[in-house]
Amino acid sequence: MNVVTGFDFPDAGRVELEGREITSWPAHRRGRAGLVRTFQHGHLFRGLTVRENVEVAALGAGAGPGAARRRAGELLGLLGLAAQAERPAAILPHGDERKLGVARALATNPRFVLMDEPAAGLHEAEVPEFAAVVRAVRDDHDAGVLLIDHNVGLIMEVCDRIHVLDQGRTLAQGTPDEIRQNLDVTTAYLGVSVATEEVVEEMTDDD
């Protein structure tokens, strides 16, 4: 995630955005090109209100003050945060922090949104609601989504293609159905091959 978004630079290989090499680009240039991210631990402007957090992102993307305020209102309504608009970001519940991170990303009119473990710290009851947020980014805002997470249910529900890593190495890649049937994935998930049926059952609970 850090390498793709320009917070770190690779020792080898290259990063491309829609066929154009951007390996040497700093993070702010990648952001202007439409490649934005959310963070695992918020990175909110905690001294600002919820609305101001989104306005700042829109202003940074070139919107005027009035347009930024309107955009913030639209996005907070979309993500169910309108009632929290004037609250300090510092006192938001964890799930709402995640939504605010997505709202800030969308305020920049991105082409791609990268989400770093967005389900970390969420209660299981909050995951389906956040899955709807991810789908809205893709379907309503026409932005591609790259999502990294350990929550199998979220991954299976929202991803069209899945790339599974084990100890930093590619273990499998494919559609959710292909991953469900991959014995290497189920073995790595629990660490024992006899656990395959249990893992497949967990992966398919929501089907």
Label every PLM stretch briefly.
Residues M1-D207:
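Glycine-rich phosphate-binding loops of nucleotide-dependent enzymes
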